[in-house]
Amino acid sequence: MSAREKQISIKEIYEVNKMEQKLKVGILGATGMVGQRFIALLENHPWFEVVTVAASPRSEGKTYQEAVGERWKMTTPIPEAVKNLIVMNVNEVEKVAATVDFVFSAVDMTKEEIKAIEERYAKTETPVVSNNSAHRWTPDVPMVVPEINPEHFDVIPFQRERLGTKRGFIAVKPNCSIQSYAPVLTAWKEFEPYEVVATTYQAISGAGKTFKDWPEMEGNIIPYIGGEEEKSEQEPLRLWGKMEDGIIQKAMGPKITCQCIRVPVLDGHTAAVFVKFKKTVTKAQ
């Protein structure tokens, strides 16, 4: 049975550890920093096997190792299973889709270009799991942290109806800045938080950089990161939203105020969070 003939549902993806055969995965935007991170994280993964790497036309036809060259930014070497894969043209959607069960998307394009190409992949009946922000506010695209809002996957049948697909869909992750505090705030919902003030201290990897690329960041900070504050204030409300009439409606609160600072750290974001609750919270709780 070919990858295209397999009918793999969300439930099956969650239960893939029970499958005897790994899912065949493609990485879109594989030569960029986020694509590299996907490849490093998926090395020897028990559920997934990277079989396809796709990037811009200038990398097409090269081995992955040749295409990346000295731009490999991970601390571990390029995985042996990936370095000799031939890079495909990410714009040749049908050709790439025919080789995989689903794709992780990390393409570096404009917002509208990302929206268009991810929908093209979904319309080939290829599920798209995206690291990009382009579809985070598309009403029928689930933006999910599984520990917070797995029920948002229920919007996928409505998305499929819009796209005209049976298997293809798009799902996205939220901005990296909120993943440190949104899960904790979710756990505290019973105490009815109504106001949140957060300051995030974000590593340079969030900008796709290393200290080799960005030496001026050593011993330096940038007190404002364009676009990050809005994402940090609004995206948690979408995670806590409800599905109504086939779309995700964001929650009305709590009110979140955020300041985002770039700091001279290679990897890992930190958040200092102040929360006001309507209900009294004890130290033990």
Locations of regions flagged by a protein language model:
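N-terminal Rossmann-like NAD(P) cofactor-binding subdomain of oxidoreductases
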Residues: 3-4, 10-223, 255, 283-284
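Charged docking surfaces used in two-component/phosphorelay signaling
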Residues: 205-285
